[in-house]
Amino acid sequence: GAKSFFERYLGASANKGYHNKMTGFRSYFLTFDDGARLEIMNRPGMDDPEKTLNRTGLIHIAFSVGCKEKVDELTRLLESDGYEVISGPRTTGDGYYESCVVSIEGNQIEITV
């Protein structure tokens, strides 16, 4: 799931999590080396519509890995593990070196320097 994805590929550490046995709701806080935190949650029966670039709201989440070589390396690893690379690695028109991968649950992860 999402927790394992962020731990394996982006070095997150997860707390023990919270589980409401009555509703089935679960959440985890993931902590990254720079102190950033991300909460992931789910519960049975949640609607998960298809995610596309042509919508409003959250389109992707970006993670900085430090250098071009790490962008390339992580992109290759994700692709070899079966994740769809939808752009890059490349330098964008606004000067960012990045790739974009479709990850768990159709979420787009941008990997940047």
Regions found by a protein language model. Name each.
Residues Y28-F32, L38, E50-V113:
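Vicinal oxygen chelate
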Residues N15-K16, N42-E50, S87:
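A short, acidic/glycine-rich surface segment
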Residues Y9-G11, R55, Y83, S103:
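Alpha-helix termination/capping residues and helix-transition junctions
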Residues G1-R37:
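Core segments of cupin and vicinal oxygen chelate
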